[in-house]
């Protein structure tokens, strides 16, 4: 498997989690929508499914790991940054095969692609603190 397949899976997962957060729809429905309506060529679909399922089912646990490092209420964090932080925290916590530097770098790239202008700096700072605490 090429790393780019996982990168594409992460990009799709961020969009799906963002949609789930805003819509409140069932995760299975969000997954189905993304796999049928989005271009999935070159996407590691099983990794996409794991990220979506793992991040959504463990969101409360992930949020508990993220929140102590925030300087503002979690509900004030933009939905896209929340999605990126949740995915990266999932990888840092449950995917020991993913080096922490890779998880953080991928999250920074996702925040640059989808987030606010300096969102990647915010994401980087929070993830660095999470890693330092482990």
From Swiss-Prot:
Q: Which Gene Ontology MF annotations are present?
A: RNA binding
Task: Please cite one Gene Ontology biological process associated with this protein.
Answer: transcription antitermination
Keyword Transcription regulation part of the UniProt annotation: yes
Q: Output the Gene3D superfamilies linked to this UniProt entry.
A: NusB-like
Pfam families for the chain: NusB
InterPro entries listed in its UniProt record:
NusB-like_sf, NusB_fam, NusB_RsmB_TIM44
Task: Cite the entry's keywords alphabetically.
Answer: RNA-binding, Transcription, Transcription antitermination, Transcription regulation
Which SUPFAM superfamilies does the record associate with it? NusB-like
GO cellular-component terms in the record?
cytosol
Biological role: Involved in transcription antitermination. Required for transcription of ribosomal RNA (rRNA) genes. Binds specifically to the boxA antiterminator sequence of the ribosomal RNA (rrn) operons.
Give the similarity note.
Belongs to the NusB family.
PANTHER family, A to Z: ANTITERMINATION NUSB DOMAIN-CONTAINING PROTEIN (PTHR11078:SF3), N UTILIZATION SUBSTANCE PROTEIN B-RELATED (PTHR11078)
NCBIfam families xrefs:
nusB (TIGR01951)
* Protein name as annotated: Transcription antitermination protein NusB
**Originating organism:** Shewanella loihica (strain ATCC BAA-1088 / PV-4)
In the UniProt record, the gene name given for this protein reads nusB
């Amino acid at each position: 498997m090429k790393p780019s397949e996982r990168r594409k899976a992460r990009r799709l997962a961020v969009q799906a989690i963002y949609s789930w957060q805003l819509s409140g729809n069932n995760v299975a429905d969000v997954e189905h929508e993304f796999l049928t309506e989005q271009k999935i060529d070159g996407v590691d679909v099983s990794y996409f499914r794991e990220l979506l399922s793992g991040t959504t089912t463990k969101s409360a646990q992930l949020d508990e790991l993220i929140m102590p490092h925030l300087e503002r209420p979690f509900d004030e964090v933009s939905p896209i940054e929340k999605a990126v932080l949740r995915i990266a925290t999932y990888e840092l916590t449950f995917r020991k095969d993913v080096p922490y530097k890779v998880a953080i770098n991928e999250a920074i790239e996702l925040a640059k692609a989808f987030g606010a202008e300096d969102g990647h700096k915010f994401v980087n700072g929070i993830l660095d603190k999470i890693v330092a605490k482990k």
